[in-house]
Amino acid sequence: MDERPCAIYHLLFTLYHSKQMSGKILSRGALRAERERLRAAGKLLVFTNGCFDILHVGHVRYLAAARALGDALLVAINSDRSVRELKGAGRPIMSEGERAEMLAALRAVDYVTVFDESSPRSLIAEVLPDVLVKGGDYRLDEIHGREEVEAAGGRVLSLPFVEGASTTSIIGRIKAVTSDK
């Protein structure tokens, strides 16, 4: 069987998707410039952050709800180093590059950036989004960057948590299935 059509399809698929996603995954410098462009156009920027390790339906629903709150959604993900610091050895399961690419592939997500700090507070202070959101497992007073966003006239919201949809529970289910063998 001739494998050239499959190889050509794979190459075209990869080129198309990397071009589509490369414009969504931004460095901090590019993010600052994009934020100024959005601000000048009068567009509302929504910001959220997290590890997003093992993307699941709870993430997808949460991000769609967050995107509906403004004109553009920025998702800031923890670097691999900061995920290890927060979650412990063996995490993240997916590398920061893989997590960024998967998030960038979602229609609801306009921009993705990676931060290496343990808290996104300095990034939030740089970007000053119009809306800052976290999942319902956070109380408003626990959301990093709340003070900065509110002081600039922005809103801070906690969106409902999707029960049973968590990376930790998925990892637990996988371990249970594999330990039975």
What are these regions (language model features)?
Residues H10, Y16-D180:
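Nucleotidyltransferase catalytic core that binds NTPs
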